[in-house]
Amino acid sequence: YDASLKPNLQIPQKNIPNNDAVNIK
């Protein structure tokens, strides 16, 4: 998970490791 891809994402990547993969679509 690269936080730099979603700088506006407020959800902790620790809790949502797949969140970026879901939002990137």
Curated annotation (Swiss-Prot):
<feature type="compositionally biased region" description="Polar residues">
    <location>
        <begin position="10"/>
        <end position="25"/>
    </location>
</feature>
<comment type="function">
    <text>This enzyme hydrolyzes cellotetraose, cellopentaose, and cellohexaose to cellobiose and cellotriose but does not hydrolyze cellobiose or cellotriose.</text>
</comment>
<dbReference type="GO" id="GO:0008810">
    <property type="term" value="F:cellulase activity"/>
</dbReference>
<keyword id="KW-0378">Hydrolase</keyword>
<keyword id="KW-0326">Glycosidase</keyword>
<keyword id="KW-0624">Polysaccharide degradation</keyword>
<feature type="region of interest" description="Disordered">
    <location>
        <begin position="1"/>
        <end position="25"/>
    </location>
</feature>
<dbReference type="GO" id="GO:0030245">
    <property type="term" value="P:cellulose catabolic process"/>
</dbReference>
<keyword id="KW-0119">Carbohydrate metabolism</keyword>
<protein>
    <recommendedName>
        <fullName>Endoglucanase 1</fullName>
        <ecNumber>3.2.1.4</ecNumber>
    </recommendedName>
</protein>
<keyword id="KW-0136">Cellulose degradation</keyword>
